[in-house]
Structure formats: structure tokens, C-alpha cells
Curated annotation (Swiss-Prot):
Protein's UniProt keywords contain Disulfide bond: yes
The protein, known as: U14-theraphotoxin-Cg1a 3
Notes concerning its domains: The presence of a 'disulfide through disulfide knot' structurally defines this protein as a knottin.
Species assigned in the record: Chilobrachys guangxiensis (Chinese earth tiger tarantula)
Tissue expression summary: Expressed by the venom gland.
Modification Lysine amide occurs at: K77
Protein keywords: Amidation, Disulfide bond, Ion channel impairing toxin, Knottin, Secreted, Signal, Toxin
Function: Probable ion channel inhibitor.
Signal peptide residue numbers: 1-21
Transmembrane segments: none
Similarity annotation: Belongs to the neurotoxin 10 (Hwtx-1) family. 65 (Jztx-21) subfamily.
Statement: the UniProt record of this protein carries the keyword ATP-binding: no
Length: 77
């Protein structure tokens, strides 16, 4: 009787650990997907700010390099 109760408790603990581990993997996959989408949106916003290759961005310290606004670049030099 005691052995069967112990086995049931160990089985429940093993299932709980396995389910928790699989949830972590699913959450990591979702987080990676969301980060990718948000990064892509930020990239699109940066491209929208650029007027073209090596054009000035809104901030005079920024300029477009490959259609992305980047800091610490001097446009045309």
C-alpha cells in the first residue's frame, strides 16, 4: 500500500516536471516569434524614416545607411 502511494506521488511529480518543461519550450518559441515580429516592425519603421540611400534622418546626427537610420555616421563622407 505504501509503495503504491509512493509510486503514484512520484508519477504525478514526473508528469508535472515534464509538463512544466514543455510549457517553457513553448513559451520560448512564442517569445522568439514575438521578438522577431517586433524587430521586423522596428526595421520597417527605420526604413520609413529614411528618404533614401545616405539621406538625412530626422536627427541630424543620424543618416540612412542601406535605408536604415544609424547613429554616429556622417552622411556623404
Amino acid at each position: 500500500m505504501k509503495t503504491s502511494v509512493l509510486l503514484v506521488i512520484l508519477g504525478i511529480a514526473a508528469i508535472t516536471v515534464q509538463c512544466t518543461a514543455s510549457e517553457s519550450v513553448e513559451q520560448d518559441s512564442l517569445r522568439t516569434f514575438v521578438d522577431t515580429v517586433l524587430g521586423w516592425n522596428a526595421e520597417m519603421a527605420s526604413e520609413a524614416r529614411c528618404g533614401g540611400w545616405m539621406a538625412k534622418c530626422a536627427d541630424s546626427d543620424d543618416c540612412c545607411e542601406t535605408f536604415h537610420c544609424t547613429r554616429f555616421n556622417v552622411c556623404g563622407k
